[in-house]
Swiss-Prot record:
Pfam families: PNP_phzG_C, PNPOx_N. This is Pyridoxine/pyridoxamine 5'-phosphate oxidase. It is an enzyme of class 1 (oxidoreductase). Keywords: Flavoprotein, FMN, Oxidoreductase, Pyridoxine biosynthesis. Homodimer. GO terms for molecular function: FMN binding; pyridoxamine phosphate oxidase activity. Pathway: Cofactor metabolism; pyridoxal 5'-phosphate salvage; pyridoxal 5'-phosphate from pyridoxamine 5'-phosphate: step 1/1; Cofactor metabolism; pyridoxal 5'-phosphate salvage; pyridoxal 5'-phosphate from pyridoxine 5'-phosphate: step 1/1. PANTHER family: PYRIDOXINE-5'-PHOSPHATE OXIDASE, PYRIDOXINE-5-PHOSPHATE OXIDASE. It catalyses: pyridoxamine 5'-phosphate + O2 + H2O = pyridoxal 5'-phosphate + H2O2 + NH4(+); pyridoxine 5'-phosphate + O2 = pyridoxal 5'-phosphate + H2O2.
Length: 215
């Protein structure tokens, strides 16, 4: 390592986040920030990429990067194999957290809340617009389970391709969407000298309350 970890840092130079810029509820601000990210961030950064954290039945946390695939006034939707590790975690503990980080904008959004499955129709609607290879992969891959090697996975894919050679694959029952229903959303804007802006929204008795947190 050529540089000490203790010396690795960047200075944040963009404008701050004032209460006057923040609406009374968080979804409008998220939509605004997300639109900024779509316009500003460039590959390899994906604007809809986020880290999802779940907790298993033994209380151990796990995190991984996923893609946000739908957003409405109810919450934030992602799709996965329901039998995967994350699916098992959510079945045991339906609370999760997600974090979006947009480095070009020096912004981060943290979201916490309860997770629920979306409807079968919502899952099927999204499944049908995925590329064919991804639709076949949802059938072929025993996600999160141990396999012998890459050849085993490729064999499963070939068998799935043969199975659906004469018909279009339909959405498997073991695959679909989850929606995180937010109870807390924090907007973080990097500022100079690590004196960052943090505006936190909490859902209290069905109403959003906004507050500033110390950096």
């Amino acid at each position: 390592m050529t540089q000490s970890l203790a010396d690795m840092r960047r200075d944040y130079t963009r404008d701050g986040l004032a209460e006057a810029q923040a609406p009374g509820e968080p979804f409008a601000l998220f939509h605004h920030w997300f639109a900024d990210a779509v316009k500003t961030e460039q590959l390899p950064v994906e604007a809809n990429a986020m880290t999802l954290a779940t907790v298993d039945a033994d209380g151990r946390p796990h995190c991984r990067v996923l893609l946000l695939k739908a957003l409405d006034g109810r919450g934030f939707t992602f799709f996965t194999n329901y039998e995967s590790a994350k699916g098992q975690h959510i079945a045991a503990n339906p609370f999760a957290a997600m974090t979006f980080f947009w480095p070009a904008l020096e912004r981060q959004v943290r979201i916490e809340g309860r997770v629920e499955k979306v409807t079968a129709k919502e899952s099927d609607d999204y499944y049908q617009v995925r590329p064919l290879g991804s639709r076949l992969g949802a059938w072929a891959s025993p996600q999160s389970r141990v396999i012998a090697d890459r050849e085993e996975l490729e064999g499963l894919v070939k068998a799935t391709e043969a199975r659906f050679s004469d018909t279009q694959p339909h959405c498997p029952e073991h695959w679909g969407g989850y929606r995180l229903l937010p109870e807390r959303i924090e907007f973080w804007q990097g500022r100079a000298s690590r004196l960052h802006d943090r505006l936190n929204y909490r859902l209290v008795d069905g109403q959003w309350q906004r507050e500033r947190l110390a950096p």
